[in-house]
């Protein structure tokens, strides 16, 4: 299936050759623990204007899937453009044990390829920390921290393109206990003026409508609203710094909602994710129903930057 999905994803875009001075920036916005509960994707009880606007300006993929519904395995796959089982990275956080995992000979993380091509490479959380602390990596193999130049692309040389990743907490914002969820929803009330009431939550049919589950889903929808707000801030940074018009933005999550039948499960709720790609050379307002995988963003990003796709990349 990977050959089919990569062809479908690349076939959407016009990958005309570009000069070094015209090379686009590439920004991946990767969100934790969130399914496609955005207004542009489905009927939801919240508004997501920034995600919707990004989708309207680019391509919205309606059948995008991750190859693993847990973060470290998923991230190990998309940072290399390889199935996790092909590189020995399929056990969750196996790289944290006493026995370290190395990538097979010749396999390289995509930031190394961008950096080698002259790109300034960054990875950060949001807001970007002034101390240049890197954002979430969570790879199940040993990697060279030097493949990242820092956390903020604003520190690059003049006219130098950047390859950046911004890692957002997404569904994790709501916390893991009733107390942390309540604190989070109080902060939502302060920011938005109201929290999502349980009365508007429509649960999937396989969930019992108990107070615990309804409250958690209401908090989850608030985390979706918050993620949408943060995306708006990220896009504003691009516009303020004059980079928006020359930046390809990839918006995706690392797996579905953290709930039974979601995160860690191979049900659709765990592996189906939103995927939106927008930027120069990409016509807006398009939707695709082709089945694509999250590892497809890796060769696609290289192609859109007019960089060679390694033969080993899946």
Regions found by a protein language model. Name each.
Residues 22-27, 57-62, 116-122, 158-163, ...:
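Loop/turn elements at helix/coil->beta-strand transitions in domains of secreted/extracellular proteins
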């Amino acid at each position: 299936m990977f050959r089919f999905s990569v062809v479908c994803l690349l076939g959407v875009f016009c990958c005309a050759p570009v000069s070094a001075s015209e090379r686009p920036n590439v920004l991946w916005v990767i969100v934790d623990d969130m399914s496609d509960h955005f207004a542009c994707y489905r009927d939801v009880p919240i508004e997501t204007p920034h995600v919707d606007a990004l989708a309207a300006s680019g391509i919205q993929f309606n059948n995008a899937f991750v190859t693993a519904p847990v973060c470290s395995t998923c991230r190990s796959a998309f940072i290399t453009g390889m199935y996790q089982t092909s590189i020995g990275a399929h056990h969750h956080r196996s790289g944290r044990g006493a026995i370290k995992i190395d990538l097979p000979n010749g396999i390289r993380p995509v930031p190394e390829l961008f950096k080698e091509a002259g790109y300034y490479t960054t990875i950060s959380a949001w807001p970007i920390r002034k101390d240049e602390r890197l954002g979430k990596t969570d790879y199940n193999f040993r990697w060279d921290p030097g493949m990242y130049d820092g956390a903020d692309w604003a520190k690059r040389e003049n006219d130098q393109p950047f390859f950046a990743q911004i890692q957002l907490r997404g569904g994790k914002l709501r916390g893991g206990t009733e107390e942390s969820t309540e604190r989070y929803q109080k902060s939502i009330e302060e920011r938005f003026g109201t929290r999502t009431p349980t009365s508007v939550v429509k649960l999937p049919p396989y969930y019992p409508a108990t107070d615990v589950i309804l409250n958690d889903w209401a908090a989850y929808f608030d985390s979706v609203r918050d993620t949408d707000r943060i995306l708006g801030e990220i896009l504003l940074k691009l516009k303020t710094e004059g980079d928006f018009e020359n930046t390809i933005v990839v918006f995706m999550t690392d797996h579905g909602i953290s709930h039974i039948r979601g995160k860690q499960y191979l049900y659709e709720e765990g592996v189906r994710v939103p995927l939106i790609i927008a930027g120069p050379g990409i016509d807006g307002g398009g939707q695709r129903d082709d089945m694509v995988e999250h590892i497809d963003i890796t060769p696609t990003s290289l192609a859109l930057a007019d960089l060679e796709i390694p033969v080993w990349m899946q």
